Design a protein with these regions (language model features):
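Basic amphipathic alpha-helical segments that dock to polyanions
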Residues: 443, 460-468
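Flexible, acidic/Gly-rich N-terminal and inter-domain linker regions that tether
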Residues: 1-105, 154
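Short, cationic-aromatic polyanion-contact patches
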Residues: 233, 357, 478-495
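Local cysteine-cluster metal-coordination motifs and their immediate loop/turn environment
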Residues: 109-125
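Amphipathic alpha-helical substructures
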Residues: 455-456
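Short, amphipathic alpha-helical interaction segments positioned at domain boundaries
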Residues: 485-512
Length: 512
């Protein structure tokens, strides 16, 4: 029976003989030119058919069959593999060595505080009504900024910046301004036209004047947490948020010139129905944000204490969750939205959709991005950074984070230094997640490998997916088909060496 390996491996007798004279050299040169022209034509043809290539089809039978647990691949290897052997000392050494590359920088700030706890939340957060907790935390963040900045050359530009949480808008307007001022004190930020500066906003914590301030201090993108407008659902998850609050922030963002507005929804929450969720979705479509994130609620009460407040019997059954996802996917695609991947949709003219068509889209801990070559510095409790071929994570408990900072120590407590195999597999997984296609020759040139030989144990795992119409594999590469786009995590798992080594439950959320 013919397998993927048979499809992409050339026959042994197909190796061309070496040219013996000038005429043969000329023939070879002409062949190379012809191949280059064909490649250029193929690239132009791909661009011309971009809309067709970005279609997404929801196949319920396939979704059910492939609905398993798996990583989200915001990193590879995933954080499960991080090790305390990679400590602050090694992290600092890697950062200094990275200056030779001259790569631009990306900054992620974690602001962990929330006024109230949302019962569905799996983020690292501190629920408190005490706003006075913010300043001692920010004072430590400023000290960390100083320590981190000392590791990087001052001419390395910050092209990407993100405030996440928690709830970044928990801090006061004066503290927001101060945090951005301190950031500019220690790092050089790109100008507004080139920088991607984003913030996560809880509309209950922001009003028009807050949005005006955020634009003034440099933010040009935002994501709004909505989840669902249905009042019964909101009460069940302890997040009461009116539609008017959301619309006020969205309209203010447009008035102030924010270049990208994203809205987050969650399906699978208590009491959700197809009709109820579609009512929320229709209202969101009417206001036409630039991007939408449709997240699957992963109910893991044994790991996340707030989720214990959600009764299992109040959750929609699996078939209803799938019905919600199907209705949402079909409604958005029929309305002209493109499925970027990993729960994200965008309008065809959005920069993420354009970057995906151009082959320049990237994915990291901050989600999809158009800034691929940045070294990412994580600032604040539990933040994760990516510098050169390493990942490093800060302390996850506030007290230990404070202790490190107060003693003049970088708070990095674990991480991983990628070997060549890790880097190669990360490249393959990133290409698939971002572009839904893989060019074998390009990977072979970049990594000096024979793809079929190197991935001899991975490629056979795709056989069943090919038969099911999720993807196509030939001697040129892999192309994910419309039915396979929603199952891209399953496809990437075939190239994950760490999953091969695991036995028993792997502890990740469901892919759908």
């Amino acid at each position: 029976m013919k397998t993927m390996l048979d499809t992409i491996r050339p026959a042994e007798d197909a190796t061309p003989e070496q040219p013996q004279n000038q005429a043969q050299n000329q023939v070879q040169h002409q062949a190379q030119n012809q191949a280059q022209n064909q490649a250029q034509h193929q690239a132009q043809n791909q661009a011309a058919h971009a809309d067709r290539d970005q279609r997404t089809v929801f196949d319920l039978d396939l979704i059910k069959r492939y609905d398993q647990s798996g990583p989200r691949y915001t990193s590879y290897p995933t954080a499960v593999e991080f090790d305390p052997a990679f400590d602050a000392e090694r992290y600092a050494q890697v950062c200094r060595e990275s200056n030779a590359s001259g790569r631009p920088l990306s900054l992620y700030f974690h602001i962990p505080f929330c006024d109230t706890v949302c019962f569905y939340c799996a983020c690292n957060k501190i629920a408190t009504k005490d706003r006075s907790m913010a300043q001692p935390y920010l004072d430590r963040v400023y000290k960390e900024l100083e320590m981190q900045s000392a590791l990087f050359d001052s001419d390395r530009i910050v092209e990407q910046l993100h405030w996440g949480g928690g709830t970044p808008t928990f801090i006061s307007q004066a503290q927001m301004r101060e945090l951005m001022d301190q950031t500019r004190k220690y790092f050089k930020l790109a100008d507004d036209d080139h920088g991607e500066f984003s913030i996560e906003i809880d509309p209950r914590e922001a009003r028009g004047d807050t949005v005006k301030l955020l634009r003034e201090i440099g933010f040009n993108r935002m994501s709004l947490g909505v989840q669902d407008f249905d009042n019964r659902v909101q009460q069940a998850v302890n997040r009461i948020q009116t539609e008017a609050e959301t619309m006020e922030v969205l309209e203010a963002a447009r008035d102030e010139g924010f270049r990208s507005i994203s809205i987050d929804l969650i399906y699978g929450l208590p009491y959700q129905t197809v009709d109820g969720f579609m009512t929320t979705l229709e209202r969101i479509i009417e206001v036409n944000p630039d991007r939408l994130s449709i997240f699957n609620y992963a109910h893991l009460p044994s790991r996340f204490k707030p989720q214990r407040r959600i009764a299992d019997e109040d959750l929609p059954p699996p078939e209803v969750k799938l019905d919600i996802l199907q209705a949402t996917t079909e409604r958005l695609t029929n309305a002209g939205w493109l499925y970027i991947g990993m729960d994200h949709f965008a309008r065809p003219d959005d920069e993420l959709a354009l970057a995906q068509r151009d082959g320049t889209l990237y994915r990291n801990f901050q989600g999809y991005s158009t800034h691929a070559e940045c070294d990412l510095i994580g600032i604040g409790v539990t933040s994760i950074g990516k510098v050169a071929n390493t990942y490093g994570q800060n302390r996850r408990e506030l007290d230990s984070y404070y202790e490190d900072i107060d003693n003049g120590r970088l708070p990095v407590f674990r991480g991983i230094e990628l070997n060549r195999d890790d880097e190669l597999r990360r490249d393959v997984i990133t290409r698939l997640i971002c572009h839904f296609r893989l060019d074998f020759a390009d990977v072979e040139r970049h990594w000096d490998i024979n793809f079929a030989d190197y991935f001899a144990t991975s490629l056979p795992k795709l056989d069943g997916m090919v038969e099911d119409g999720l993807l196509e594999v030939d001697s040129a590469g892999i192309r994910v088909l419309p039915k396979g786009r929603l199952l891209i995590r399953n496809i990437c798992m075939a190239f994950d060496a760490y999953l091969e080594a695991k036995k028993g439950p792997i502890g990740f959320s469901k892919v759908i």
